[in-house]
From Swiss-Prot:
HAMAP family: Ribosomal_bL31_1 (MF_00501). Belongs to the bacterial ribosomal protein bL31 family. Type A subfamily. The gene is rpmE. This is Large ribosomal subunit protein bL31. One of its GO terms (biological process) is translation. Keywords: Ribonucleoprotein, Ribosomal protein, RNA-binding, rRNA-binding. The keyword Ribosomal protein applies. GO terms for molecular function: rRNA binding; structural constituent of ribosome.
């Protein structure tokens, strides 16, 4: 294997949407960084089975619905 081509692997803190925190190892961020999740398995309709609305971050959901909403299911 080539030397010095792999990213640094360190411990970070992950904060779920309900405030639950846990530590894991990752190449994301730097040692001790905090990753705040906007959508996770506790809030995503695919895992909750609900028909709840997704939070529209940056207009992405609105843009999608505007473009494909007329197709219907």
């Amino acid at each position: 294997m080539k030397a010095n081509i792999h990213p640094d692997y360190h411990t970070i803190k992950v904060v779920m949407t309900d405030g639950t925190e846990y530590e894991t190892r990752s190449t994301w961020g730097s040692e001790g960084a905090t990753m705040n999740l906007e959508i996770d398995s506790k809030s995503h309709p695919a895992w909750t089975g609900g028909n709840q609305q997704l939070m529209d971050r940056g207009g992405r959901v609105s843009k999608f619905n505007k473009r494909f909403g007329s197709l219907g299911v």
